[in-house]
Amino acid sequence: MVEQQQQEEDIWGQILRESSNKNNYFEKRDVAILGDPTSGKSLLLSKFDTVSNVESLKSIALSYTFSDIYEDDTSEDPVGRINYWSLEGEASQNDLLKFSLNKENIKNCMVIITLDFSQPWNLVESLKKWLGILEEHIKSIFKDDKNGFKNLQDKLSIKWHEYEEPTTTAATTTTTTTSNNIENNTNKTSPTTDKIQTNNVQKKKKKKVNISSAEDASVLPPLSENILINNLGVPILVACCKSDSVVMLEKDFDYKDELFDYIQQYLRRICLQYGAGLIYTSARKEINCGVTLEYIENILFGFELKSKTQLIEKDQIFVPAGWDTLAKIQVDFENQKVCKDTDEPYENIVKKPSIIKRREQTQTNSIICDDDQDFLGKIKSQLDNDDQSSINSPSTPSPLSQSSNNNNSNNNINNTSTPSINTPLQPTDKPLSDIKSSNNPVAASPSAERAALANFFTSLISKDKTSSRKDLKSSLASPPTTSVSSNAREDAKKELDKLKQQKK
């Protein structure tokens, strides 16, 4: 009995020891993601089945999340973990790059530079900017360790030589034609949804490729022309996000296939100099997101890459590092008719549309609103000026006076004996002012209305809320009264009394 209890305790102890050392079972790798603020980093990262909600990490200067990699769909324990560090993209935050890419993790790290393909006129400028920032940062890391930097450069050169084009293509293309979809359905694969596609890439059987035993780059054959002339010692992947924008560019800006080919070949030339891979992705249309994750696993963990190079579909370009050469680019470059001069600046061919310039100019002219109290104060002063001008200006003549003036002018022309307007009128029961007010009762009201409005805005400006409310209620409750209106009422009462006496 005692021996059985000891065996059970040993079993539980073994389980606890294994769980405590669980972190030692898988390797960890890091990915630093760089790019402009709206280049599509977060959406691309959200397709990698990360632990954190990537959308909630937006507008954070340096965000972090990770995803675990499993050997197959039946595995419970991960075989690897990828740590993703995403820099928001503001120039003032470049110093934070030291937390995601430093001397401790640079040997097991790769860099992804995201570009916004919906604005192709900014692609080269943005790519060169981030490559310059990355180069300056890496050189600052190894400023006192030249040998360490040389070892990383040799390692990247060896990785370039080791690339081999896959012999079979996995069903990881996110957007395919109808015929391809039928073929995929026959093979019981469904690449139509990105979530399924990403999980297939993560949970498929992982197979490590045979890595060459070469450790010295000097024994390898020399690289071809323009390859790795700017060797930073770190694997780089240039991801052109929002590649589904080709439809918008064709429709709104009249982009042709030849111009897309020119853009692709120009980017390939830059990637060749840094030994970088190139891929077009779209998180919204689920294009090449799974291929991107598969490529990351191949670079960091050495897992087999089953996706072939893609140069046919203009929104699904994929050129892995190690496949391209300057000769291949030149062959494709000669077939396009946009520009034959390789030294022509990119900005002269892919020009920024003028409509975008006007839109940016209107956005820069920001409108600053006045403070509420200042705004109400301006209205009050304007009302006060209107009241003052109405008092100083002569009153508008009534229709009666205008008609009498017309009669007077006509009588003067005809030299008749009819008295002019200056002739005294016969006495009546009502004064002329009362007649005017009775015929046009609104004549005296504008000043009263302005006074009410002035009181209203004065109450809003007042700091004392209680007193302002009382003034507002009193100004709105009591209608404007004048001495003219009271005289009119008395005259009306007298007329009624006269009528009553006549009936008697």
From Swiss-Prot:
Binding site for ATP: G35, D36, P37, T38, S39, G40, K41, S42
Ranges of compositional bias, category Basic and acidic residues: 464-473, 488-504
Main location (coarse class): cytoplasm
Any one Gene Ontology molecular-function term assigned to this protein's record: ATP binding
Region (Disordered): 167-195, 383-446, 464-504
Any Pfam family: DLIC
Keyword line: ATP-binding, Cytoplasm, Cytoskeleton, Dynein, Microtubule, Motor protein, Nucleotide-binding, Transport
Disulfide bonds: none
Protein role: Acts as one of several non-catalytic accessory components of the cytoplasmic dynein 1 complex that are thought to be involved in linking dynein to cargos and to adapter proteins that regulate dynein function. Cytoplasmic dynein 1 acts as a motor for the intracellular retrograde motility of vesicles and organelles along microtubules. May play a role in binding dynein to membranous organelles or chromosomes.
Annotated family: Belongs to the dynein light intermediate chain family.
UniProt protein name: Cytoplasmic dynein 1 light intermediate chain 1
